Amino acid sequence: MTLEFSTLGLAPDFVDYMKGWDTQRELHDKVVAAEAPSTVLLLEHAAVYTAGKLTEDHERPFDGTPVVAVDRGGKLTWHGPGQLIAYPILKLKNRSGIRDYVERLEAVMIAVMADYGINAERIKGRAGVWIKADSKGPDRKIAAIGIRVLDGVTMHGIAINCNNDLAPYAQIIACGITDAGVTTMSIEAGRTITPGDIAERVVEEFRKHEEALVSSPEGALL
């Protein structure tokens, strides 16, 4: 296999955001140089707000909570305990296939959620994975995507709300969205689902897309 997986830390071993970002950048440089294989990093972060390149001032926390500015696309979001993060550091087979890459990330999450009876889907014009409006409420986001591609290798990735507290979202305009809500797998399934519960299924779903996504450059360590 050309794709590897590394668990940096799940509850109670939460990963500081800056430490995780440093790990991403170091691994990215190695993958670009063909000194390491494409790898998906799995983890839970300690609580933090991060702001993508499109974040506007009025979308920042209302209480002045510090925010980490990052080099991914997208806007402001929260990461923390109860949310599974996957950072694919992949050398893309098709360097121009960014839309296909994003759709495959969405497919990974949708398939995992289906295992728990959760009907997650894409909504046109909205990034990430969603539960469409129903008797429980309006459209609500259950997973986020924010990526960067540099020198043909991806960074950042996906965040799946498993059993995280939604209170931090009340302090921000999450992802710049004002007309929809936020939810978790646990809320939608009616039972507790943790990042540790779904991590292996996320790995299995990524494996299904490996051949289509991941380049195997000569000289890479496989």
UniProtKB/Swiss-Prot annotation:
Substrate binds at residues 72-79, 144-146, 157-159. Pathway: Protein modification; protein lipoylation via endogenous pathway; protein N(6)-(lipoyl)lysine from octanoyl-[acyl-carrier-protein]: step 1/2. Gene3D superfamilies: Bira Bifunctional Protein, Domain 2 (3.30.930.10). Catalyzes the transfer of endogenously produced octanoic acid from octanoyl-acyl-carrier-protein onto the lipoyl domains of lipoate-dependent enzymes. Lipoyl-ACP can also act as a substrate although octanoyl-ACP is likely to be the physiological substrate. Belongs to the LipB family. PANTHER family: LIPOYLTRANSFERASE 2, MITOCHONDRIAL-RELATED, OCTANOYLTRANSFERASE. NCBIfam families: lipB, PRK14345.1. This is Octanoyltransferase. It comes from Arthrobacter sp. (strain FB24). The gene is lipB.
